[in-house]
């Protein structure tokens, strides 16, 4: 455990001042594609906390595939807060050891999701395979890079967006299952998380299209430059609502509840929402969203819960061992 803990952490904190009081350090266990957001958000919160409380606070980060991160917390990684990309991964903390209460999503606004995102296609410059919408991904010879839906919320949103496309265009569940099965036959390798999938596509130059969240497109541009890819918005996307929660059993043991709760609440502040928009996450605050309207194309979103039922049902039907995904997917 000690080895896992030290290997997982990326310090994002300010150095502790000699004379100033220090607050209890916080560990935020998060998913792959949020690295850049929290690199900007954490110093902003540290400045706010110092102004409010007169204390320095160290914030440590752990990133990885969403479900793998949740499993690490269940197995003992002492996260004060968990910031995942879908509710199932926080539900798992409630179901395994009662690390959070079952009603965790009601404790903050917007079902505890401070921003939203869309699923997009990252294609090679010039879009040589003419990939514009979900059916295009099924063309002969098209290789689709997407992370594993069983370990990555990013992958689950891709799966559900493709399924929802069929339903919104008059297909039934059987047609949707067939469509998504064909889509995953186009996948050359299933990485465990969104950042690994980006490396496969951009660095290793595998695949014709990377399916990911729209904020990852901006992260790719910052890391690799804008010259090698284009962003395509498909006609339909599940609305990604990445939730956050205080891990009650950890903060009670560490005495860090006040800091942890303030850290998450500040995500809804004007500064937190502006940082979200700067990182291509759609802010909940409508005034701030309007200020950044040029970077957020209108998308035909559908709600996962209204289309598929609650996330626990989605997980049980589609993504558990032996679920629908296992039925339709076989490695190439």
Curated annotation (Swiss-Prot):
CDD domains: PBP2_CysP (cd01005). One of its GO terms (molecular function) is sulfate binding. One of its GO terms (biological process) is sulfur compound metabolic process. Keywords: Periplasm, Signal, Transport. Belongs to the prokaryotic sulfate-binding protein family. Binds thiosulfate specifically and with high affinity. Has no detectable affinity for sulfate. NCBIfam families: 3a0106s03 (TIGR00971), PRK10752.1 (NF008022), PRK10852.1 (NF008106). This is Thiosulfate-binding protein. The gene is cysP.
């Amino acid at each position: 455990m000690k080895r896992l803990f030290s290997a997982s952490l990326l310090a994002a904190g300010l150095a502790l001042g000699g004379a100033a009081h220090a607050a209890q350090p916080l560990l935020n266990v998060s998913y792959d594609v949020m690295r850049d957001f929290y690199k900007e958000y954490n110093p902003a919160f540290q400045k706010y906390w110092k102004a409010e409380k007169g204390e320095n606070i160290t914030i440590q980060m752990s990133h990885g595939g969403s479900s793998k991160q949740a499993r690490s917390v269940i197995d003992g990684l002492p996260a004060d807060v968990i910031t995942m990309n879908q509710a199932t991964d926080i539900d798992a903390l409630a179901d395994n050891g009662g690390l959070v209460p079952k009603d965790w999503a009601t404790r903050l606004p917007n079902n505890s999701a401070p921003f939203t995102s869309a699923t997009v296609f990252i294609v090679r410059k010039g879009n040589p395979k003419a990939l514009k919408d979900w059916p295009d991904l099924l063309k002969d010879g098209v290789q689709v890079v997407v992370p594993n839906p069983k370990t990555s919320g990013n992958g689950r949103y891709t799966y559900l967006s493709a399924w929802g496309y069929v339903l919104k265009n008059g297909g039934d569940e059987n047609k949707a299952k067939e469509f998504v099965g064909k889509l995953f036959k186009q996948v050359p390798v299933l990485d465990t998380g969104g950042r690994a999938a980006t490396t496969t596509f951009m660095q290793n130059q595998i695949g014709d299209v990377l399916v990911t969240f729209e904020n990852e497109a901006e992260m790719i541009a910052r890391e690799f430059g804008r010259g090698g890819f284009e962003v395509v918005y498909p006609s339909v996307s599940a609305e990604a609502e990445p939730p956050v929660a205080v891990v009650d059993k950890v903060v009670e043991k560490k005495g860090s509840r006040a800091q942890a709760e303030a850290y998450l609440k500040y995500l809804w502040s004007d500064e937190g929402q502006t940082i979200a928009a700067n990182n291509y996450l759609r802010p909940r605050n409508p005034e701030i969203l309007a200020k950044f309207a040029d970077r957020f194309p209108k998308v035909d979103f559908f709600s996962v819960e209204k289309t598929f039922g609650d996330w626990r049902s989605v997980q049980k039907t589609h993504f558990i061992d032996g679920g629908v995904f296992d039925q339709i997917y076989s490695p190439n």
